[in-house]
Amino acid sequence: MNLPYVDTSALAKWYVSEPGSEAFESFVQEFPRVVISRLTMVELRCLLARRRRAGDITEATAEGAFQLFQGDVARGHLEVHPVGDQHVMGAVALLGHLRAHPLRTLDALHLAVAQATESRIVATADRVMARAAEALGIRAVTFG
C-alpha cells in the first residue's frame, strides 16, 4: 500500500482542533499509517509553542498534543523518515524545477522527502505546496 505523505500544516489538525480537523481525521483513518519527515517533529513543536505564546492554546494543551504525537510515532502510526543531504539536494532541484510555484524552503524539503518515499499523495493545508505537488504528479489533498 502506498502511504500518503503528511506535512505539518495538515498533521497539526490531528492534534489541535481547528478548521479542517474533522476532514483530516477522516482522511488519516483511511490508512494504517502515514509518512512524515523528521522535520515535522521540529515544525510541530514550533507550531504548538507559537500557538501557546499567542494564547490560542494553553501550555497543558501544547504539551499534551506533543505527547500524543510522540505516542503516535512510538506506536508506528506515523512513519518518520530522516531528512538527509539527498533530500536537501532534492529540494534544491525542486525549487529549480518548480519556478512558477513560490515554494518555501521547508515545503520544498517536505516534497523532496515525499518523492523519496514514493508517496503518491501529499496531505497539506498549504495551497502553494498542494499546487507544487500536483505539478510533480503527486495527488494533493488539502485541509483547511
Segments the model singles out, each with a brief description of its role:
Residues 1-42, 47, 51-64, 136-138:
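Short, well-structured N-terminal submotif of metal-dependent ribonuclease cores
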Residues 19-22, 102, 142-143:
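Hydrophobic/basic alpha-helical segments enriched in Actinobacteria
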Residues 20-22, 67, 108-111:
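A generic local structural motif
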Residues 45-94, 135:
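Active-site-proximal, substrate-binding regions of enzyme catalytic domains
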Residues 75-131:
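Active-site neighborhoods of divalent-metal-dependent phosphate/nucleic-acid chemistry enzymes
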Residues 80-83, 140-144:
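Short acidic-hydrophobic, aromatic-tinged amphipathic segments that line or gate anion-handling sites
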Residues 127, 136-141:
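C-terminal binding/interaction regions
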